[in-house]
């Protein structure tokens, strides 16, 4: 029996070791970059398509991380999502330029009033005010990348989770005619803002029904706002998921094929 347990333990360790090595390899595909303007810097990681050719044009994806991955190490933002875009299979099927920016610890992607004394947290999203510093830099960086000849401007995409889902909704409000499609996981926003992009941007919204960090009602209200303003959103509400509904979202077999199938006219 001891021998069987030992063999089983070794197999588990080998599988875990292989999985960790694969994740490390996928993260290594993302080069460390810095967007610098005046005295401000936005760290980001950049993955180019396999056999990148600057004379060709490629779709571009912006992925916005959650609050837990904020910082200045230019690494933590790859914890969630990098394996989805960096897998060998998806790089073959969906060649794209993928950008993972990192929001500093003391900032937020979206302009949000956050009260963490409640569970789920209380959130309010004022409209028509200046963007946060990180959002401003992100907007500027987006504008700069959009001028590059190897970026297909008809195939710009954005997505994010938690705080990044909130940032996704705000980015769509600020740039309603820019993105070909978007996805927001366990996020939140101001339903009134959906009027700007409901009819122009296909979106897939995800949330866990048991989310005790960001109330799933927040996504329901955003979807309702999109519907009322003429949009046709996809909505996946996972009955058993808590806040980590990104695991289920990333496992959706149609997510990337749906995302990249959309083109901006």
Listing of model-derived features with the role each one plays in the protein:
Residues 185, 193, 202-265:
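C-terminal catalytic histidine-bearing segment of alpha/beta-hydrolase fold enzymes
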Residues 21-60, 68, 96, 133-140, ...:
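A domain-start/cap signature at the N-terminus of enzymes
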Residues 64-65, 207:
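The conserved beta1-alpha1 loop
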Residues 143-197:
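Primarily recognizes the serine-hydrolase "nucleophile elbow" in alpha/beta-hydrolase
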Residues 69-135:
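Active-site machinery of serine-nucleophile hydrolases
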Residues 79-89, 186-196, 217, 221:
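Alpha-helical scaffolding within the catalytic cores
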Residues 51-56, 110-161:
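Gly/Ser-rich "nucleophile elbow"/oxyanion-hole loop immediately N-terminal to the catalytic nucleophile
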Residues 1-27:
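Bacterial Sec-dependent N-terminal signal peptides
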